């Protein structure tokens, strides 16, 4: 629930900010979120997945490799099956649909949030299973890191919805609904991973692959478009540093 709280608080910005997010601010927020997700994918998911497969010797990378690619392909499949519209775009993706712009914008961020919920779920599954390499602190750090990047993410969806003409209440609700999938995904992944604990490295790297797909497909283009695109790069580095520090110092 901690990451979902971050989304809700970010979405609440619509009640306190009168104007829509400027392009510069939106690129900074997208860059920060991307940095957090990349660092979380490396330190919280991929490295533990490889470490837990050390018994395989030179093939210890294999579970992480397989899980990573399955995660990428899973998000690619969802991208093609679910109609959605990225913030700031006029061209919808996925199958043709009569859904409104608001609904498709919410669906785009919902797709983004699926791997984040899965990442939290698989970390807690490892902790509850007694995995020595996944502690309560490391699971909590990942939850906090995703909550931190969910705050700007909530604002990124609620503020454009407001700019589209939605009321503040409906814009807030749209932002909140986009994050509901996270606790649901976390619980489902936690239950699935606990049923097949030996496959935990695959689950960890699956979540990493899905998260990095979102970063490359959505956040990097969003943080790099238009003039002053270097602001997105700077905030990417800030987000990466924050998540890396949290994971190494506290995890």
Model-flagged regions — what are they?
Residues 1-251:
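Intrinsically disordered, metal-sensing/regulatory segments
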């Amino acid at each position: 629930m901690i990451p979902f709280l971050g989304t809700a608080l970010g979405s609440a910005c619509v009640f306190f900010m009168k104007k829509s997010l400027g392009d510069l601010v939106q690129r900074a927020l997208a860059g920060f979120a991307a940095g957090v997700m990349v660092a979380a994918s490396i330190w919280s998911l991929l490295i533990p997945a490889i470490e837990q497969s050390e018994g395989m010797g030179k093939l210890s990378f294999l579970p992480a490799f397989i899980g990573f690619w399955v995660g990428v392909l899973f998000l690619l499949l969802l991208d093609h099956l679910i109609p959605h519209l990225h913030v700031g775009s006029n061209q919808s993706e996925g199958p043709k649909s009569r859904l409104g712009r608001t609904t498709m914008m919410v669906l785009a961020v919902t797709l983004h949030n699926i791997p984040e919920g899965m990442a939290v779920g698989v970390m807690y599954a490892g902790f509850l299973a007694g995995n020595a390499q996944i502690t309560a602190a490391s699971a909590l750090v990942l939850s906090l890191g995703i909550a931190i990047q969910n705050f700007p993410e909530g604002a990124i969806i609620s503020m454009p919805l407001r700019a589209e003409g939605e009321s503040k209440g409906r814009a807030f609700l749209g932002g909140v609904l986009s994050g509901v999938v996270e606790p649901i995904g976390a619980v489902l992944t936690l239950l699935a991973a606990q049923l097949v604990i030996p496959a935990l490295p695959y689950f960890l790297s699956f979540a990493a692959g899905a998260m990095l797909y979102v970063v490359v497909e959505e956040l990097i283009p969003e943080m790099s478009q238009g003039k002053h695109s270097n602001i997105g790069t700077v905030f990417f580095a800030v987000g990466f540093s924050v998540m890396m520090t949290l994971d190494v110092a506290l995890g």
